[in-house]
Amino acid sequence: MKRRDFIKTAGGLAVAGSLGGISTVAQGCSSVPRFNMNKLGTGAGLKLSFAPYELQLRHTFTVSSYSRKTTPGVQVRIDYEGFTGYGEASMPPYLGQSVETVTAFLQKVDLSQFNDPFQMETILAYVDSLSPGDGAAKAAIDIALHDLVGKLLGVPWWRLWGLDAAKAPSTTFTIGIDTPDVVREKTRECADRFNILKVKVGLDNDKEMIRTIREVTDLPLAVDANQGWKDREEALDEIFWLKENGVVMVEQPMAKENIDD
């Protein structure tokens, strides 16, 4: 069974017995509106809209190659029969994507030709065919479409996929490169709310960053050098030292072009 067939079948079972255009299903103490599957393909097409925004960061965020006080994003929404799915495009600078490239791609997308959001493979294949790249914009549409379908069914995706929410991977809190005082402050703010912390490294104060954090917490750490270590020898020296200090994962140790090392 293909993914869209599974989703549509699951949706039909989920709303069987519903009365009128929208029914509700109790989930805990709340009622979640659900879509009448009999209306699929009979109404207007999907409506795509988007809005760029800029988040103001509480602390200046520094990595090995740049610093910033804000971070841009583009919110994507897909509307269908009174339901709305949301997605977000995140644009890492090193991937060459920006608010401008994301919005330029989204302006090409016409989802009004589709009046059944459960045709996910067809819809996403169309979106992918519009350009060879633009991963951030495509991901935002993908997320919004999944969010919409989950809301139409009144069922979260972790449940549709048969996952255990209690066993979901931990989310990290990222601590940017900064002075010891600010690093201590950031660590105190998050240490009791996360099971693992992610630390930006890749400059000449890597050990100072880790030692400062260790003054506050003994939580497991992941580090991201953002391609800041120059060669294999430097990277290995750093990695061995980091392992001795409770670091369990290293991300982007060297330049992305340096594949052989």
Language model segments and positions:
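Short, P/G- and charge-enriched loop/turn segments at secondary-structure junctions
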Residues: 60-65
